[in-house]
Design a protein with these regions (language model features):
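Hydrophobic alpha-helical segments typical of transmembrane helices
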Residues: 2, 13-15, 88, 125-128
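Transmembrane helix-loop junctions in multipass membrane proteins, especially transporters and channels
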Residues: 52-64, 98-102, 123, 127, ...
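Transmembrane alpha-helix boundary and packing residues in multipass membrane permease domains
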Residues: 4, 48, 52, 90-91, ...
Length: 166
């Protein structure tokens, strides 16, 4: 979705029309990234509502406000962290008309490697976003993650994104 939204001006050849508006490309891109963040939050919320509906329809026990609120916070928090983790890839590949597909492939691989288990993954941005919402996510495999390296990783990834955007 990010590549599609960001490259519309190039693929539809509307950049010349937009350039008459007194905003810089950086401001336009920042606005689109904000829309993508809001879409991330909305899709996270919709996913939680669907999960809630399935739980109620299936009659699973343990569906109460405390669990639901915890689910919503964790899912939305993890997805915002994943958004921040993928942001440098989005920014690096968004500047040309048809190059965003390479960014999609790279982001897929980048996310895939986040599914592995290991202590070094405290420093892997995709896994770090999940560690921030549940540091015991792989305790059953004997791996205990730490929140502070994960937090540092997410902050550094965000700072790298802001440097690329500047």
């Amino acid at each position: 979705i990010a590549g599609y939204i960001i490259t519309r001006e190039y693929t539809d050849d509307t950049m010349k029309n937009i350039s008459t508006i007194p905003i810089s490309y950086r401001q336009l891109l920042s606005g689109k990234l904000l829309v993508l963040l809001l879409l991330t939050i909305c899709f996270s919320f919709i996913g939680c509502v669907i999960a809630l509906a399935i739980n109620i329809i299936a009659g699973f026990s343990g569906v109460h406000f405390g669990n639901l609120f915890n689910l919503f916070i964790r899912v939305i928090g993890a997805n915002i962290g994943i958004y921040i983790s993928v942001l440098p890839i989005i920014l690096l590949f968004c500047c040309s008309a048809n190059n965003f597909l390479g960014g999609v492939a790279l982001a897929f691989l980048y996310g895939y490697f986040g599914s592995f288990v290991g202590k070094l993954l405290n420093y892997y941005p995709i896994k770090a976003s999940m560690i921030l919402v549940d540091s015991a996510c792989d305790a059953k495999y004997g791996v205990i993650y730490q929140i502070s390296p994960a937090c540092i990783t997410i902050v550094l990834t965000f700072l790298i994104s802001m440097i690329i955007l500047a």
